[in-house]
Amino acid sequence: MSQTMLSCTGATRPTSALLRRENRRTQKTRRMVRAAFATQSFGPCSCHGGEHLSDERKAELVSVCEQIGAAGKGITACDEGPGTIGMRLENVGMVNTEENRRAYRQMLFEAPNANKYLSAAILDPETLYQKSDSQKHNGKLFPAVLSEIGIVPGVKPHLKVYALPGQSGATVMQGLDSLAVRLQEYKDAGCKFAKWRSPMDIDVANGQPSDLTIETNMLDLARYALICQDVGLVPIVEPDVSLKGDHDLETAVRINVKIQSVLFKAMLDHGVYMEGALLKSNMVNPGKNCSKTYTVDEIAEANLEVFRRCFPTAMRSANYLSGGQSLEDAAARLD
């Protein structure tokens, strides 16, 4: 006795007849899909990022990403330019000379057990070509010293921001034009990754960040990431929304989701190999002048919400920057 299945009309059909009909439909669908794919061009700008990279290059990028994203460790940002670090030296009575900057970096890099807590260090280009004069590492460039210690050396390759005309003071970063040449020099000096920062402010009254501001900055980050991987460096992309303003936490979540969604789509559209890239983003917070107070748990949940909505699981790790917050607040919100 043949079995029967209930059809959508309530009548019955023999199972074998249904299977034959479904098989014909499946074969027709497969032919249509093959025909559609035959007319499409899936080049390096498809969603299969990294098609232009060799398997060896991909493996190298992933390996560096895994080292940087090691559990229980963090990235130290030592990429202040001479002017910025000079103000800090002067605050403690030191003259801002290249030798004092070098000695300060050496003290940080060669501190006992630094590699237990740090996975990577972001350097200013000046620091790449400075040498240690310690007994253990005498004469070695700082990138080599860091590598020997077990800390991955990287570099800040971007230049300065300039204002986007007609965008209420919103900015975009300079440095893409000469990026490939400089990145090759930095790699030759011992760097394994680079970090590009795109700063933005939330200014609800002036409509910032506008679509133009977001798209301009995120497209630059995507192109930077593509160039990095072509040279052989892991790109860390840093969309940095500042704490300026009086916006609430809900507004911060909405805008950060939009920014990161535009960023990750741009990276895919550019053909960036997502497994060989890392995110370094601001911690999602209300504006410093917000009239409403939020708990640590509410802010932590807001950050998780942003990741749940847009973070690509192909990426090995996401890293927070703590700028604008006290160490105690940043640690509590991260924990």
Q: Which residues make up each language-model segment?
A:
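N-terminal chloroplast transit peptides
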Residues: 1-22
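Alpha/beta catalytic barrel-like cores
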Residues: 42-189, 202, 292, 296, ...
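Conserved, mostly hydrophobic/aromatic
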Residues: 97, 196, 237, 279
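Conserved radical SAM core fold
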Residues: 128-129, 160-164, 199-207, 242-246, ...
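Structured alpha-helical segments in the cores of large, soluble enzyme domains
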Residues: 176-193, 217-233, 259-270, 300-310, ...
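A glycine-rich phosphate/pyrophosphate-binding beta-strand-loop-alpha-helix module
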Residues: 188-210
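Active-site acidic/histidine proton-transfer and metal-coordination neighborhood
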Residues: 212-236, 240, 244-254
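Active-site capping/gating regions of soluble enzymes
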Residues: 247-335
